[in-house]
Amino acid sequence: MDVSYYDGPKDEVIEAMLKSAVTAMKLGQYEDGKGRLEDTMEFGTSNFQLLGTIYMYYGRVCRHLNHDAKALEFFEHELNMFKLIFNYPEACDSTRRIVQQALKMEKFSKARRFAEDLIDYTSNKKNGEKYIGQARILFASVCLEGCERDVESNQDEKKKLLSICAEQIAAVKLFNENNTEGAVSETKIMLIEAKCLSLDEKYEESRRKYQECIDFAIKTDQFEAVHIAYYDKALYAETYLLFFIIRDLRSALFYATKFGKERDVVKYKSKLSEEMLRNGEFHEAYLYGLEALVSIRKLGLNEHIGDVLLTIAKCLIALGKRRQAAYFIILGSVLTINQSSFKLFYEQIDVAMNQERSETATDQDACLAIDSSPDPTSSNDMINKFVVKLEHATNVETWEMIVNGIIEDQKKPVAIEKKENEEPVDMMDLIFSMSSRMDDQRTELSAARFIPPRPVSSASKKTTKSHRILPGLRANWTKVQSMKFDGHTMNRILKRSKKSKSSLDSTNSIQGDDTRSDDVTMTSK
């Protein structure tokens, strides 16, 4: 490995820069946080642990900004860095992030390969054996995900995935019996086992296992596991009776509200709204859906918004409030214009217009003037003033043309109408008005003002071969000679670096996501 003499800035400087980037992320300023992390990598460091942490945050911010390919790339850099220095706990966490990102990008084979690699990595290293239980649980969850998503069209292959999952669960149980250090949580094992039974259509056994998990989690004060167990039980084990599904979802929502994260509450409200709609409880379903919509906008969980808008629209149609339903249908249609779910919104506007036509006198035109009053955050004048006519819903192609027209109208600049008999503006009044506005702006400082400025240094211009092998790496030969590395990982990094050059400026793959599954926290390394 070719390294340079220059060691880069001291760790304290890099840590301060990293902290500045994380602060920006906490404030929701993800583009700025991304830029600060890129500056940090341009400065570079020879601290492998610190560099791995930088990669982790850069992957997270890319994931939040929907730069999925770049996020996956830097999670892989993170994993390689921690494998190099035999940091097994961080390697497990890195692999988990890679698996989640790969599954999100529908790269099941890649997720499976990394999960299997983690088992090999931990089982072949003396100090890594205590983490093999975590590796096996991760591999089991990947197999279940593949089975659930029908990545294998062949039924025999699906059975094989479930068989692998069962084998991994048995191996983890055996590991727990023989090891106290590194033992996997019993609730985690029971959740995986119950889901495996459900996907294998052993529903009665699955329900018993979920209930066993719930009882054990309550007894041991693991309340976060309780809401997960109730939700999974509703999703996988209660296959036919809506009463039991809704009951379990209510329990999941109760525990998530008290002990879970906001995104869990949103997910459960959204699902509860769907199931109550199926059960004919339209108004309560509508209220849960509206609450979920407000939280989705607040948290930026855009991956759920289409489903919630569709559920709300269906509820309002069932309640006979077609003008309000039309508003949410248009919102959903605009958001899903290039997606397969667009057709679902067309089907609802078709239902609403057919109902409106049946209740309209034959000598009058059937139309729906939009009513956005149920939406507390509505500020779209273009949609609010729109009137849906019967001919708009002739077919899905016609509706697509109408929605595209709305989108194009929204892009046009708003014309400023000149008021009649408008008096000329006095110059002194204008000066005093501008001065007053400037005073107001001085007293309302944005949160960004309190973030340290992004530093600039000539050090960032000094690029080394080690920096090109891994972004931000400025290795000092004296320091490297005294360190022990994982040879297999090092050889793989060097081999990959010959085939392609990693760059912060390479093209990103833009896909839909949500990204706040991990809390943004600063960890001192």
From Swiss-Prot:
Subcellular location: Cytoplasm, Cell cortex; Cytoplasm, Cytoskeleton, Spindle
Top-level taxon of the source organism: Eukaryota
Regions that span the bilayer: none
GO biological process: cell division; establishment of mitotic spindle localization; mitotic spindle elongation; nuclear migration; regulation of G protein-coupled receptor signaling pathway
Chain ranges of the GoLoco domain: 424-445
Role: In the 1-cell embryo, probably together with gpr-1, controls nuclear rotation and spindle elongation during mitosis. Complex of gpr-1 and gpr-2, in association with lin-5, activates G-protein signaling to affect mitotic spindle force. Polarity determinants (par genes) may regulate lin-5/gpr-1/gpr-2/goa-1 locally to create the asymmetric forces that drive spindle movement.
Subunit details: Interacts with gpr-1; gpr-1 forms a complex with lin-5 and GDP-bound goa-1.
Protein name per its UniProtKB record: G-protein regulator 2
Organism: Caenorhabditis elegans
